[in-house]
């Protein structure tokens, strides 16, 4: 049995809590927690603490995070991600220089309004659930820190840039 950490890949379409429940059934442990929440439509590594290791979760939650993400230029959706309905579009696509140089403007302490389709809880309910029900959710800006932000690739033909960031909790 024991006390340990597991790094699980969380695919798109499943909540962090559901992944924890699946792992509980597989390994037969009831004391499992996750270090942070990935939105349902996000994919990536979700650290799971088992047994007494759950006492260390807060240390990992407060640690710096790294993400790789893509941005599609020229399209705005109602959800802020690829799953939403397109609500606006523009023909303007930034230049390669603009895509790469904009990064420095975001380094440091900034205020971020989380997207309405996020896993943040509003009165005990995930914001994305309220948004899918058509309820208007106003999320308050949060202080976050971006330690590093780099453009890794820019596909001008498809208007997609891929970025790397190192940040405090609560960024994406």
Swiss-Prot record:
Pfam families: TruB_N. One of its GO terms (biological process) is mRNA pseudouridine synthesis. Its EC number is 5.4.99.25. The active site is at residue 39. SUPFAM superfamilies: Pseudouridine synthase. The gene is truB. This is Putative tRNA pseudouridine synthase B. Belongs to the pseudouridine synthase TruB family. Type 1 subfamily. Responsible for synthesis of pseudouridine from uracil-55 in the psi GC loop of transfer RNAs. It catalyses: uridine(55) in tRNA = pseudouridine(55) in tRNA. It comes from Rickettsia prowazekii (strain Madrid E).
């Amino acid at each position: 049995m024991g006390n340990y950490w597991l790094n699980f890949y969380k695919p798109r379409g499943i909540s962090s809590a559901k992944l924890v429940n699946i792992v509980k059934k597989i390994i037969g442990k009831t004391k499992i927690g996750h270090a942070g929440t990935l939105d349902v439509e996000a994919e990536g590594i979700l650290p799971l603490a088992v047994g007494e290791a759950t006492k260390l979760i807060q240390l990992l939650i407060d640690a710096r995070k790294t993400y790789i993400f893509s941005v599609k230029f020229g399209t705005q959706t109602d959800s802020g991600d690829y799953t939403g309905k397109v609500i606006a579009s523009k023909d303007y696509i930034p230049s390669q220089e603009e895509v790469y140089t904009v990064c420095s403007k975001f380094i440091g302490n900034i205020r971020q309004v989380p997207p309405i389709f996020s896993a943040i809880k509003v009165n005990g309910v995930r914001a994305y659930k309220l948004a899918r029900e058509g309820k208007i959710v106003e999320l308050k800006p949060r202080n976050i820190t971006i330690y590093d932000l780099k453009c890794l690739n820019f596909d001008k033909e498809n208007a997609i840039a891929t970025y790397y960031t190192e940040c405090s909790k609560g960024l994406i």
